[in-house]
Structure formats: structure tokens, C-alpha cells
Amino acid sequence: LAKREKLRILLAYELRKQVVTRLVERIHNAERVNDMKQSMIDRLNELGGQGKPFVFCLDYEMSELILLEEPLAQQELLFDIGGVTNSLARSVSDTPAVLRAIPISEEAYAERFAVIRHALERGDSFLANLTVATPIELNISLEEVFLRSQARYKCYLPGRFVCFSPETFVRIVGNEISCFPMKGTIDATLPHAAETILGDYKETAEHYTITDLIRNDLSRVSHHVEVRRFRYIDELVTSRGHLLQVSSEIVGQLAPDWRAHLGSILSELLPAGSISGAPKEATIRAIAEAEGEPRGFYTGICGYFDGETLDSGVMIRFIEQQADGGLRYRSGGGITINSQCAEEYREVCQKVYLPFV
């Protein structure tokens, strides 16, 4: 009995030691991550304060920053942001683009959906953006996708990803900061498409939630925050036809010295509310559990600072290249307590498309 008791005490001690060791490792890892984040913020603040132009991509986890000065002269990252581009004239083939998707199974999606559903039922979240990665095959290069895509925010990093996003993160002109969260799409050819999407209860509830979240986020960095436009419609041209996209515009006023705090402002607003959810911190934890892998640059942000103004986008509509050369198309959608798994699964599958005809 004495030997057993000694063994039990020894095992308990070893277990506690392992737990403490793992806790210390997590603390050290967290400190390293925080140091990296602060370094990125400081660098953005520095360049903004100096009025130096740059282009950047910042990943969802805020663990990797691509930051290039003299953005129009470099060719490491091809970009076209709000019509400003470093993409030199290149010939584009007239080969019809063919994208073949190999979707994850509905059962696999349902497992992720169940994690989010449980968080909603517990009250941890009332809107969460659940995303998936769909393996695809393409008959054209990612550079060709970049060149042929029609989108306000386009980035191509060879060997890593191409992004062709319609969604603005923030624009800053003068001292005014603006956000344009997107929530809700519908096939533009459907009868009464605009009336249908604007009258949809679930879409309306999601839009109210995300607009309120963004308004609160902007209030952390600016004053006189207001919703200037609520649920207006844009039309998108895609390889699957025309879509109607619902957005809102929220604006605030920054302090005159905002350029010297540009990195800090962006950090306060990240991750974007439209691709995370509300309340943000608890929802991010639920998303991480459900998705089971880092998002990387997908749903991060890209932007161009010309020394005076900033234009940045949320990196949705995104194809990533894996180490073995395989391609994955990332897509997602907002989940609420009223969401149906089968409908959400269809939506993420339908979002796998190219933004050109």
C-alpha cells in the first residue's frame, strides 16, 4: 500500500509538473506572439507617421505581415487596390477558365456547424462566420486569375495565394474613416431578387448585428460615428452570373494625427467583424474550435497607403496554394440561431467561383 501511495504521489507530481511546463510554454508562446503583433503595429505606425507609401497584407491571426515600401515599383506582391496597381501590362489568354471544386462532405460541414450551434445555444455568440476550405482544380494559373478578376481588392503572392475581394475593410480620407461590411448575396436573375434579399429575416438580422458590431468597433478609434447607409445593394459579375450584394456604410471622425497611429487603429478593429462575429472575442474562440486550423491570410486584410489616404479590403474570395502545389478555395457564411445546416452548406459551396465571365 505504501508503495502504491508513493507511486500515486509521484505520478501526481509528474502530471502537475507537465501541466506547469505546458502552461509556461503557452505563456512564452503568447508573449512571442504579442511581441510580433506589437512589432507589426509599430512598423505601420512609423511608416504612417512618416507619410511613406506602402502596400500590405496582414493575416487573420495577426501573426504574419507582408509590408512593402515603394509599392508601385516592386513586383514581389502584385496588387490592384481601388484601381491603384503595380501590375505591368501582361498578355492574358482567352482560354475559358474552368474551376472544378471537390467540396467537403455535408457530414464534415455539419460537425463544424454543430460546434458553432452549441456556442449560439450557450449564449457565447449570436453571429459567427464559419468558413471551409474546398480543394479545387484550375486550368489557369493563379496569376491569370489575378489578371482576369474583376474586384476592388486584388492581391497575388506567388506560391501562396490570390485574392479577389469586393469587400472594403476601412477607407480613410482626410480624417474620416469608413467601413462597408457586406452581409447577404442573391442571384441577380431571380424574380424580385432585390426585394427578396432585403426582406429576408435571417439576412436582415445578421446585417443589424454586424452593423452594430462595426459601429462599436469604430467608436473605439473615432468619434461622431454614424451609419450613413444601411443595406444598400451592389451588383457583382462572376463566372456564375450576376449577384446582388448587400452592404452598409458606417463612418467616424479620426484625430488629425491618425497617420502616426495607423497600425494601432487597424489593430483595434481586427479581425474584421464581418468575418468573425459578435460578441467578437467569444465568437473567435468558437470559430477556432469549429474550423480546427489557422485561416492564415484568408479573411485577413490587404491595403494601400499613399502617404495621405488608406484603402483596405477584407481578403475574402481567396484561393491558397499549399506546399504540395494543391489549391484550396476558402469560403464562409454567417451562422445565427435561425440558420439551417443544409442551407449554410449550400451557401459555402455556391461561393466557390471566379469573379469574371
Model-derived features: positions:
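Polybasic, lysine-rich low-complexity intrinsically disordered segments
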Residues: K3-K6
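Extended alpha-helical targeting/anchoring segments
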Residues: L11-V357
